């Protein structure tokens, strides 16, 4: 069951700056890491490619985690990699210091299709300067990370967890390098049922969430 929306992870598409790849269509006939097998990154990559009209036959898809993909991109063994994570992703930040990279923006048509198809998606801007050498904003898709718990956990425990997340949000910011925010009002956009303990917390604050 859902407990809380945590922060927006963004779909980042990374290429070498000298690759000549400037848009999603340029990935055609290229070798692209779509993330580890069965990962959230792979799912998002497949959604973005589908909405962009890029079928499996048009690219050479490989499965790698972020760290491996960054190394392969640096060495020129792949042309691009997808990474769904919070901005200021450490792996991408380190890569940007070791070689010149570019993050690819998604076009409005792809973004509009993603927003229509998936309720947890949002338009997301990666500000200029987020990574070394990134001199302009990058427009992409954000996906809300959702905390999940077993329904067997007690209502009191889950209600307290939910309360802690939102009422001590600043403490979490100091504990990570990620650029994160917690917005309680995004909970009503989650399309999976919430744990009854979490739902009780939201109800007290006038927020309706899905419970079944």
Feature names for model-found ranges:
Residues 1-28, 33-36:
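Short, glycine-/small- and polar/acidic-enriched structural segments
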Residues 3-10, 96-97, 105-107, 139-142:
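Short Pro/Gly-enriched coil loops immediately N-terminal to beta-strands
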Residues 9-11, 28-30, 62, 99, ...:
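Envelope-exposed proteins and targeting segments
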Residues 18, 36-43, 64-67, 82, ...:
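Soluble non-cytosolic domains of exported or imported proteins
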Residues 30-36, 144-152, 184-192:
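Second-shell loop/turn segments in exported
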Residues 42-62, 74-77, 94-96:
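Ligand-binding cleft/hinge of the Venus flytrap
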Residues 64, 68, 74-75, 85-103, ...:
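An extracytoplasmic/periplasmic, membrane-proximal ligand-sensing/linker region
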Residues 102-160:
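C-terminal lobe and pocket-closing loops
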């Amino acid at each position: 069951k859902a407990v809380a929306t945590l922060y927006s992870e963004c779909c980042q598409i990374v290429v070498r700056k000298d690759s000549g790849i400037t848009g999603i269509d340029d990935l055609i006939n290229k070798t692209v890491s779509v993330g580890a097998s069965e990962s959230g990154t792979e799912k998002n990559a497949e959604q973005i490619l589908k909405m962009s009209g890029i079928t499996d036959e048009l690219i050479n898809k490989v499965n790698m985690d972020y760290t491996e993909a960054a190394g392969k991109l640096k060495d020129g063994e792949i042309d691009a990699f997808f990474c769904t994570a919070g901005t200021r992703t450490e792996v991408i930040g380190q890569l940007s210091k070791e070689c010149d990279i570019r993050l690819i923006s998604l076009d409005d048509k792809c973004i509009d299709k993603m927003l229509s198809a998936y309720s947890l998606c949002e338009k997301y801007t990666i500000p200029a300067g987020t990574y070394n050498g990134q001199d302009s904003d990058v427009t992409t898709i954000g996906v809300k990370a959702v905390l999940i718990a077993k329904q067997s956990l007690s209502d009191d425990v889950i209600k307290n967890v939910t309360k802690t997340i939102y009422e001590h949000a600043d403490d979490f910011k100091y504990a990570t390098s990620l650029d994160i925010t917690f917005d309680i009002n995004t909970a009503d956009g989650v399309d999976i049922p919430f744990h009854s303990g979490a739902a009780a917390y939201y109800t007290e604050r006038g927020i309706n969430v899905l419970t079944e």
